[in-house]
Amino acid sequence: MSELQTLKAYLTQLPGTLLKLLNIDPPHNTIPEAIPDILDLYQGIERISINLIDNFGLFEITYLKPQFMIANSEVMLLLSTKNPYTLGVLHQLIYGGFEVEPNGFHLLKAINNGGKSSCLIGRQKDIERYDGGTKSIAKDTDMSTWVESAKVINTHDLSWMHYLDFENLHKQQQRLRQRTPEDLIEKLINRTDKWILGNYKQLRQNSLMIIIGDHGRVKLDLEYSGKIAQWREASVPIAILMRK
C-alpha cells in the first residue's frame, strides 16, 4: 500500500463528488463541496459502481489486506464523520448530511433528475428508507446482491451494492457459539474482495469503482488486544477508488 495515494475528506463530501463526476451540478449551498483531488483524477469517467461493505474500514484493509483491493486501489479516502455506522453512513451519502432531504436534496433523485440512471441493491428496509422512489432491487443475502450486480453495473450510470451479511451471520453464530466476530469479518471481507474482483473484470472501460467501508449496524465488542485493539479503536470509514 506504499504507492496508494491517501487523502482525508468528510464523508458528506461524497454526494457532491459523485454528482460532479457524473457531470451533474450539485445544488448550490445545499450540500458540502466536492473533493477537488478526486475530480481532478477521475473527471471524464462514464459510470460509477459503488460497493458499500459493512464492518470494513482503515483497520480491516490494513490488517486483513484483501488481495484485490490492495493490488488495484489508486486512492484511499479517510472519511471523517460523527456517525461511522451503517445507517449513519447511508444517511450522509443519500442526504449529504444528517438532515432528511435538506432543501430537497436526495442523491439518487438528483442523479435521475440530471438525466442519469441509478440502481440501488440492498436490504428491503434500507431501500424503503433511502431509495426515494428511484430504481432499487431488494436482496436478502450478499450472494444474491452480487449475482444481481452483474446485471446493473454496466447498464446504469451509478450502481450501488450493499454487502451486509455480517449482521445476520453474527447473530446466528452467537446462538450457536461458533466463530468469533473477528473471524467472521475476515472471512466475509476476503469473500467480498473476490466478488468485487469479478465485478471489476466485467465493468466496461472508463468506469470508476468505489468501495466504501462503514463500522456496521452496531458497535461490536471485539477480542483484539494490545496495539491491535488500539489500532481497531482508531479505525475510520474509508473509500477506495480505482479506474477500470
Could you say what each language-model-derived stretch is?
Residues M1-K244:
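Feature captures the catalytic ectodomains and active-site-proximal regions of enzymes
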